[in-house]
Swiss-Prot record:
Induction trigger: Induced by high temperature (at protein level).
Family stated for the protein in its record: Belongs to the DnaJ family.
Gene name in the database record: MRJ1
Region called Disordered, residue ranges: 35-66, 203-226
Residue stretches making up the J domain: 83-147
Protein name from the UniProt record: Mitochondrial respiration co-chaperone MRJ1
Assigned GO CC terms: mitochondrion; nucleus
Keyword Transit peptide found: yes
UniProt cross-references to Gene3D superfamilies, sorted A to Z: DnaJ domain
MF term (GO), any: heat shock protein binding
GO terms, biological process: mitochondrial electron transport, ubiquinol to cytochrome c
Amino acid sequence: MLSFQATVRPLAVSSRLHSPAAHIWRRNAHTAAMSDDSLDQGSSSSYGDSASQPHLGKGKGRQDSLAQSYRFPEKGMNGGPPDPFEVMALDRSATQQEVKQQYYKLALLLHPDSSHPSSSPDHFATLNKAYNLLSKQSSRSAFLKTGYGWDVSTSSGGNQTWSDSLMRAEIARRRNGGAAAWNGASRRYRDSDAGRGAWGGFDGSQGWRPYEDPSKGFSPPTSGPAEERYMSNPRFLAVVGVASAVIAWVHWHRLGYAAETHRDMLDKQNIDASRALAQARYEAATHGHIRREQIRRRVREAEVLKELEKADQGHIAVAGPPTAYPPSHRE
């Protein structure tokens, strides 16, 4: 007995020393047990409703109203493919915040890893397209006004916008209807009959076909060898180089023509000056003595006028008339 009590006392002391930790552990265990009981009661109450339906989420024992009521629309209200509002189960007056919240909820349901009946990669990609269109005010306004930007038939990634889809569709249309889209292998005429209109069709265009053709009219092909209409970079650079060379040649030609015209003008001026000088020399040689005589006469007249002016002023005495001599008595 003494040995047994001796062995028991240390345990009692140790239990007293660790009593606060043990108390905390008991309280946490009690709380966990209560939560497990409440979860068991909730799951048992909803077992009758969930027994007929598969679990809508992994590790979740309850279902919200959206998961129970939502099914991905295969057709829209008008009979065609569903629009983005129908895909996201939203009204057209939904706000941006409502669109964002609805997207987060539907992404969990339509994800390929989800157990929802509508979960699939295609539905998840369509949901991403709808969210990308409705999350931006510009694309949403354009869709509401014109209807453009939404095409369920095209397979695109989740990060692709409606403008990218339109661009890809335009490139595909140009590729199918490119410059070489008219397949020459399906022509129904000989090469010698090219360009004869309805009797032979246009060369390489499958235009107006022969009259025995059942279609009896113009029916362009829907596919071709996929040659783009737009020009490649080497061809574009070649065209730019040729155009630059032509423009440079034109400017060089104009510059040479202008220089030649200026040179001709200077030559003409020199010729005119030479002719004027020769004419002046000829007139001086022919009528020089007459002009010299006229000049001398004018000079003498000027001198006479100056002498008369001086005489009037009294600087020069004017000679009187000659004296008359008496008659001689020689007679």
